[in-house]
């Protein structure tokens, strides 16, 4: 055997896969498939038990449902005296509101405390009559009637309370974009005055896609 044949044989030997590598890869793929199936079943189970508007829960942000997008509204409450209230109706941008028959599936509130936040606030979403002026008296009654669960957000040394989100599922109600003006975000400042530089609320409204939604996040 000349030198060129010897070098070629050496390269061929080096190309041979190590024994057991193929079976190890197959075993890893099989384990991954099993894990994926288990996660899929778990997600389906959790989705089946997703709460309604009367029983919302705290969740992390997630991707929109197929065929849906979301529009975000940012609310910065004004100063709220200790023991007083603030209410703001959900008013979507005109470019979205004009498609008033598009269905809304979920509303999520995210509480974003600013560096000076040191209070305790209660936050909720309520369907309120068009005639309601969202006065302190009216909002107080809504918090007191127990008809809507409340997110209690308190100061946390880490900066953000572990549970800072509240999700409302409107799928069963067949609510649409036009209905959103009937809903309002309500805030109660429990222990002391809430200043204007302490808190921001992000309201994400998940709705069916509309022609302008190509520029909205998905």
From Swiss-Prot:
Predominant cellular place of this UniProt entry's protein: virion
Organism: Cucumber mosaic virus (strain Ixora)
Compositional bias (Basic residues): 11-21
Disulfides per UniProt: none
Region (Disordered): 1-30
GO cellular component, one term: viral nucleocapsid
Function statement: Capsid protein. Probably binds RNA and plays a role in packaging.
Low complexity bias locations: 1-10
Protein name per its UniProtKB record: Capsid protein
Keywords: Acetylation, Capsid protein, Ribonucleoprotein, RNA-binding, T=3 icosahedral capsid protein, Viral nucleoprotein, Virion
Residues recorded with modification N-acetylmethionine: 1
């Amino acid at each position: 055997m000349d030198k060129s044949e010897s070098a070629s044989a050496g390269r061929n030997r080096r190309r041979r896969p190590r024994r057991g590598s193929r079976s190890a890869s197959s075993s890893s793929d099989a384990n991954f498939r099993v894990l994926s199936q288990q996660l899929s079943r778990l997600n389906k189970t959790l989705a089946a038990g997703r709460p309604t508007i009367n029983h919302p829960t705290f969740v992390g942000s997630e991707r929109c449902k197929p065929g849906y997008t979301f529009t975000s509204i940012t609310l910065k409450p004004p100063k709220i005296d200790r023991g007083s209230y603030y209410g703001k109706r959900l008013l979507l941008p005109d470019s979205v509101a004009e498609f008033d028959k598009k269905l809304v599936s979920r509303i999520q509130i995210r509480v974003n405390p600013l560096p000076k936040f040191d209070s305790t606030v209660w936050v909720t979403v309520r369907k309120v009559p068009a005639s309601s002026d969202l006065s302190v008296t009216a909002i107080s009654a809504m918090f007191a009637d127990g008809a809507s669960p409340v997110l209690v957000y308190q100061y946390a040394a880490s900066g953000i309370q572990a549970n800072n989100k509240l999700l409302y599922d409107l799928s069963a109600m067949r609510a649409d974009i036009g209905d959103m003006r009937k809903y309002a975000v309500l805030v109660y400042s429990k222990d002391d005055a809430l200043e204007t530089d302490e808190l921001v609320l992000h309201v994400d409204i998940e709705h069916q896609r509309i022609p302008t939604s190509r520029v909205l996040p998905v």
